Swiss-Prot record:
Pfam name, any one: SET
Native species: Saccharomyces cerevisiae (strain ATCC 204508 / S288c) (Baker's yeast)
Lineage: Eukaryota, Fungi, Dikarya, Ascomycota, Saccharomycotina
Function of the protein: S-adenosyl-L-methionine-dependent protein-lysine N-methyltransferase that monomethylates 60S ribosomal protein L42 (RPL42A and RPL42B) at 'Lys-55'.
Designated name of the protein: Ribosomal lysine N-methyltransferase 4
One CC-aspect GO term: nucleus
Length: 494
C-alpha cells in the first residue's frame, strides 16, 4: 500500500473513531489523482435527495475554539476572537498542532490528507514568469502577496509573544510555510456562525431582535466536508448547520458511482484559480470578463475624434458632482473596470456611463463652456440618459461605441492561443509548468468568451434609437444641418 492510500485509510478510521463523524455507507473516499482531482467523495449506492451523507459534531471542527493551543494557553481565545481575528488565529493554531504537537495532535491524520505544498496551484504559489501567462486578466491585481507578507510578519510576532516551545517555531516559519497553511484555509475552510458569548442575560431579549449584532463567523476546518470537490454546474450536496452538528445533505438524487460535489461560491474561473488552484474545464457558470474604463475612453476618442482632456473633465464631473450623485442615489457609475458576464449580462452602471459619454461627445460646443456651465449641462444629460436606459432604450452610437470597447479589450488577449482548451486526459500526467500553462489559457478563454457574448448585449436587450432623437430632446430644439452632419454614426468593423 502506498503512502497516499495509507493516509486515506488512516483518515477514514480517524473520522469514525476520534472525530466521531457519522458517515453514510453509501459514500466512500476515492483516489482520482489520475484525473487530476486528488481525493474525492463518490456514491457507492444511489442516494436520494435530502439524504444525509455525513454528520459532524461541532467538537470535531478545527477552529480557534477547539485547537489544543487554546487549551494550553486559555488567554489566547479572547485575543484570537476579538483582536487577531479567526483567520490569523486559525493559522497560528494549525501551526501549533503541526509543528509543536506533530503526531500527538488530535488532528494529525487529518493533516496528512491535505494537499502537499508541491500540489498547490493557487496563484500565490506561481512565480512571476508563470503569472505572465495570465495577462491581461485583472486577476493579477487580486493576488494579494503584499497583504499576505504583512500577515506573515504579524503572525511571527504573535508566535514569539506566546513564548515557550512555540516561540522556536517562529525562526523557521518562512513565507512559503505561511502561504501553504493560509491557502489550505482559503481553499477548504468554512465560515461557521457563532453567538456572541459576551452578551449577558439582561440584554438577551433586546439583542435577539438584532440577530446580526450577536452573530459572528468563525473560520473553521471541517474534516470530510472539505474532501468534496467543487463544481459550479455539478453541485449536488450542501452543508447545513444546527447548534450541535453539521450535516452534508444531498441536493438531488445522486447516482451510484457519481461524484459528490459542493460549491465554493459564485466564482469565475479566474477566481477559482486564484483562491483554490484549479479551473473548471468547461468554464464556470459564473465566468465574466472585464472591460476597463480606459477601453471606453479610447473607444470614444476614436469614434468622436475628441481629446483626452475633454473626456477627463466629463468623467471628473460624473465622479464628483453632488447633484449627479443624488440623481443616481449614490450609485457609482465611474469604475476602473466593469464585469461582462458569460450570459450576456452587463452592469446597468456600465451601459449608463457609455450612453452618457456618447451623448456628451456629440453636444455642440460643450467643450468650450466654463466648468459651472458644463456641470449644469452634464447634470441635464445624466437625467435624460438615466430615463432612457431605465426605459430599456439606448442610442445607435452608444451601441456602436460599446462594440468598439469590446474590440479594444479583446485586442489585449492572445485569442489564437485560447481557441481550444482540452481538459487533461486521464492518465496524462502533466508537469507543473504544463498544468499551469493550460489552466491560465482556460482562464483567458473564459474571459474572452464572456466578452464576446456581451458584444451584442445592447442591441439584444435595448431598443436602439437614433442619437439625433435624444439630442433634440436634450437641446430642446432641432439640430442644424451642420450639427446633424457632426453627429457621428460610427461603423464598427467585425
Amino acid at each position: 500500500m502506498d503512502d497516499f492510500s495509507r493516509d486515506t485509510e488512516n483518515f477514514v478510521c480517524w473520522l469514525k473513531t476520534t472525530a466521531e463523524i457519522e458517515v453514510s455507507p453509501k459514500i466512500e473516499i476515492k483516489d482520482l489523482c489520475c484525473d487530476n482531482q486528488g481525493r474525492a467523495v463518490v456514491a457507492t449506492q444511489k442516494i436520494k435527495k435530502d439524504e444525509t451523507l455525513f454528520k459532524i459534531p461541532r467538537s470535531s471542527v478545527l477552529s480557534v475554539t477547539t485547537s489544543q493551543l487554546i487549551k494550553d494557553y486559555p488567554s489566547l481565545k479572547d485575543k484570537f476572537l476579538n483582536e487577531t481575528g479567526s483567520w490569523e488565529g486559525l493559522i497560528i493554531c494549525i501551526l501549533y498542532e503541526m509543528e509543536v504537537l506533530q503526531e500527538r495532535s488530535r488532528w494529525a491524520p487529518y493533516f496528512k490528507v491535505w494537499n502537499k505544498p508541491s500540489d498547490m496551484n493557487a496563484l500565490i504559489f506561481w512565480d512571476d514568469n508563470e503569472l505572465q501567462l495570465l495577462k491581461p486578466s485583472l486577476v493579477l491585481e487580486r493576488i494579494g502577496k503584499k497583504e499576505a507578507k504583512e500577515m506573515h510578519e504579524r503572525i511571527i510576532k504573535s508566535i514569539k509573544q506566546i513564548g515557550g516551545e512555540f516561540s522556536r517555531v517562529a525562526t523557521s516559519f518562512e513565507f512559503d510555510n505561511f502561504a501553504y497553511i493560509a491557502s489550505i484555509i482559503l481553499s477548504y475552510s468554512f465560515d461557521l456562525e457563532m453567538q456572541d458569548s459576551s452578551v449577558n442575560e439582561n440584554e438577551e431579549e433586546e439583542t435577539s431582535e438584532e440577530e446580526l449584532e450577536n452573530e459572528r463567523y468563525l473560520k473553521s476546518m471541517i474534516p470530510l466536508a472539505d474532501m468534496l470537490n467543487a463544481d459550479t454546474s455539478k453541485c449536488n450536496a450542501n452543508l447545513t448547520y444546527d447548534s450541535n452538528c453539521l450535516k452534508m445533505v444531498a441536493l438531488r438524487d445522486i447516482e451510484k458511482n457519481e461524484q459528490v460535489y459542493n460549491i465554493y461560491g459564485e466564482h469565475p474561473n479566474s477566481e477559482l484559480l486564484r483562491r483554490y488552484g484549479y479551473v473548471e474545464w468547461d468554464g464556470s457558470k459564473y465566468d465574466f470578463g472585464e472591460v476597463l474604463l480606459e477601453n471606453i475612453v479610447e473607444a470614444l476618442k476614436e469614434t468622436f475624434e475628441t481629446n483626452t482632456e475633454f473626456l477627463d473633465r466629463c468623467i471628473d464631473i460624473l465622479r464628483n458632482n453632488a447633484n449627479i450623485q443624488e440623481f443616481l442615489e449614490g450609485e457609482e457609475i465611474v469604475l476602473d473596470s466593469y464585469d461582462c458576464y458569460n450570459n450576456g449580462e452587463l452592469l446597468p452602471q456600465l451601459i449608463l456611463l457609455v450612453q452618457i459619454l456618447t451623448i456628451l461627445c456629440q453636444i455642440p460646443g460643450l467643450c468650450k463652456l466654463d466648468i459651472k456651465a458644463m456641470e449644469r449641462q452634464v447634470e441635464r444629460i445624466v437625467k435624460k440618459c438615466l430615463q432612457l436606459i431605465e426605459g430599456a432604450r439606448a442610442t445607435t452610437n452608444c451601441s456602436a461605441t460599446w462594440k468598439r470597447c469590446i474590440m479594444k479589450r479583446l485586442a489585449d488577449y492572445p485569442i489564437k492561443k485560447c481557441v481550444s482548451i482540452e481538459k487533461p486526459s486521464k492518465g496524462n500526467s502533466l508537469t507543473r509548468e504544463e498544468l499551469r500553462d493550460v489552466m491560465a489559457r482556460r482562464v483567458l478563454k473564459s474571459e474572452i468568451d464572456s466578452l464576446q457574448v456581451c458584444e451584442e448585449t445592447i442591441d439584444k436587450n435595448y431598443k436602439v434609437i437614433p442619437d439625433e432623437k435624444l439630442l433634440t430632446n436634450i437641446l430642446k430644439r432641432k439640430l442644424t444641418e451642420e450639427e446633424k452632419s457632426s453627429v457621428k454614426r460610427p461603423c464598427v468593423k467585425k
